[in-house]
């Protein structure tokens, strides 16, 4: 799986790969990850467990390449989760090949939006990635780059489904809440004014014209 170092001003991909082997059960990250990226191991492990993905006790090693660039940001959670699932053969390694991914995973498996989606999608375009997987919250922003297929996912279950069958997620519509244009709190209106029928009538007639009111109402 691919991701991108947001702190890198150059379009350099970060390849995330995982391996499982016999030995003392552990979860190790190598390849110059920052302290923030290392926290992904607990988020990912807990999120996978809470969503029914049970792993045998193994030694898990996650590598970030190239190793000469420091990896920063919570956006590596999604590619780490995908790499671990592929390493345990819960998804085929082929489905994560040449796919750009980014997103932060909560302990409940929900995938949260991150900053810097546009550079990630642009990087995917320059690298010729098959498609991008981003948090659903970032889908609208990601699709500003027209010539790159972008899928939005809300949780781990959707991530797995998307990797196995991306077409429905690449065609997914963006559901936006349309704010009401009706203001139910209008404050005072003419019904609150006692008398002054002539002034109110004049205001009604002049509502589409300029009106200057002088003196007390």
Which ranges hold each PLM region?
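Peripheral, non-AAA+ core regions of ATP-driven protein-machinery
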Residues: 4-211, 215
């Amino acid at each position: 799986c691919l991701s991108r170092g947001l702190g890198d001003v150059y379009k350099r991909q970060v390849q995330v790969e995982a391996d499982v082997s016999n030995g003392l059960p552990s979860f190790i990250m190598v390849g110059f990850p920052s302290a923030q990226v290392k926290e992904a191991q607990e988020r990912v492990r807990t999120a996978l467990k809470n969503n029914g993905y049970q792993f045998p006790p193994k030694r898990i090693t996650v590598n970030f390449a190239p190793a000469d660039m420091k990896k920063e940001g919570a956006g590596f959670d999604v590619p780490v989760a995908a790499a671990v699932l592929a390493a345990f053969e819960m998804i085929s390694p082929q489905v994560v090949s040449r796919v750009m991914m980014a997103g932060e995973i909560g302990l409940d498996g929900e995938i949260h939006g991150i900053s810097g989606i546009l550079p990630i999608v642009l990087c995917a375009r320059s690298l010729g990635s098959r498609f991008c997987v981003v948090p659903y919250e970032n889908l609208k922003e990601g699709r500003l780059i027209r010539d790159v297929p972008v899928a939005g996912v809300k949780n781990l279950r959707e991530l797995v489904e998307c990797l196995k069958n991306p077409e429905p997620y690449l065609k997914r519509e963006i559901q936006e809440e349309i704010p009401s244009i009706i203001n139910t709190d209008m404050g005072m209106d003419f019904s609150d004014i006692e008398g002054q029928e002539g002034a109110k009538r004049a205001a009604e007639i002049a509502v589409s014209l300029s009106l200057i009111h002088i003196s007390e109402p």
